[in-house]
Amino acid sequence: MAKKTYDLLFKLLLIGDSGVGKTCVLFRFSDDAFNTTFISTIGIDLKIKTVELQGKKIKLQIWDTAGQERFHTITTSYYRGAMGIMLVYDITNAKSFENISKWLRNIDEHANEDVERMLLGNKCDMEDKRVVPKAKGEQIAREHGIRFFETSAKANINIEKAFLTLAEDILRKTPVKEPNSENVDISSGGGVTGWKSKCC
């Protein structure tokens, strides 16, 4: 049997309205890349990145979920087993911020009770087009007792910090145990891609 290359496996979800930049956030973290030509994610996409925290190698299994209404029935099954959820809105799109409460209800209905949540106000490099004040993001995060960052995949602002903070929060309340399996359940997902990369 092959030796495991990690100590813990954390399943993370990126959720939020279509077009808020979830895929760009994921690619910036996983591959330090930014591409303006992404098409909307169809169903689910998966990326894997291994990071080291507190002397532990942690495999982050990050699911990028479709934001369109018609895909909500697909994505609900992916809340199960998620240990961390990043809820993303676009600071230049008021509707994406207004829908935060709906996404938070989805988390309450479908995710584990103890899931770590984080709110990201994305595209903070587009200050001239901002319609959602930072204070509003901070307020809703406070009300729900969750962490908040403003991020930019394009300018690489707070992307790594957000992922590592979420992983640290999960690690703090995770009992140390051996990872169950190398297998990834993709039985009900859409297009899935994956790679492994190591953080130095």
Swiss-Prot record:
Coiled coil ranges: none
Activity regulation information from UniProt: Regulated by guanine nucleotide exchange factors (GEFs) which promote the exchange of bound GDP for free GTP. Regulated by GTPase activating proteins (GAPs) which increase the GTP hydrolysis activity. Inhibited by GDP dissociation inhibitors (GDIs) which prevent Rab-GDP dissociation.
Domain of life, source organism: Eukaryota
Localization in the cell: Cytoplasmic vesicle membrane; Golgi apparatus, trans-Golgi network membrane; Endosome membrane; Recycling endosome membrane
Co-factor requirement: Mg(2+)
Keyword annotations from UniProtKB, A to Z: Cell projection, Cytoplasm, Cytoplasmic vesicle, Endoplasmic reticulum, Endosome, Golgi apparatus, GTP-binding, Hydrolase, Lipoprotein, Magnesium, Membrane, Metal-binding, Nucleotide-binding, Prenylation, Protein transport, Transport
InterPro entries the record matches: P-loop_NTPase, Small_GTP-bd, Small_GTPase, Small_GTPase_Rab
Family annotation (CDD domains): Rab8_Rab10_Rab13_like
Membrane topology field: Lipid-anchor
GO BP term, example: protein localization to plasma membrane
GO MF term list: G protein activity; GDP binding; GTP binding; myosin V binding
Positions of S-geranylgeranyl cysteine lipidation: 199-200
Residues annotated to bind GTP: 18-24, 35-36, 40-41, 67, 122-123, 125-126, 152-154
Residues the entry annotates as binding Mg(2+): 23, 41, 64
Function: The small GTPases Rab are key regulators of intracellular membrane trafficking, from the formation of transport vesicles to their fusion with membranes. Rabs cycle between an inactive GDP-bound form and an active GTP-bound form that is able to recruit to membranes different set of downstream effectors directly responsible for vesicle formation, movement, tethering and fusion. That Rab is mainly involved in the biosynthetic transport of proteins from the Golgi to the plasma membrane.
Free-text note on domains in this protein's UniProt record: Switch 1, switch 2 and the interswitch regions are characteristic of Rab GTPases and mediate the interactions with Rab downstream effectors. The switch regions undergo conformational changes upon nucleotide binding which drives interaction with specific sets of effector proteins, with most effectors only binding to GTP-bound Rab.
Protein name (database record): Ras-related protein Rab-10
Source species: Gallus gallus
Underlying gene: RAB10
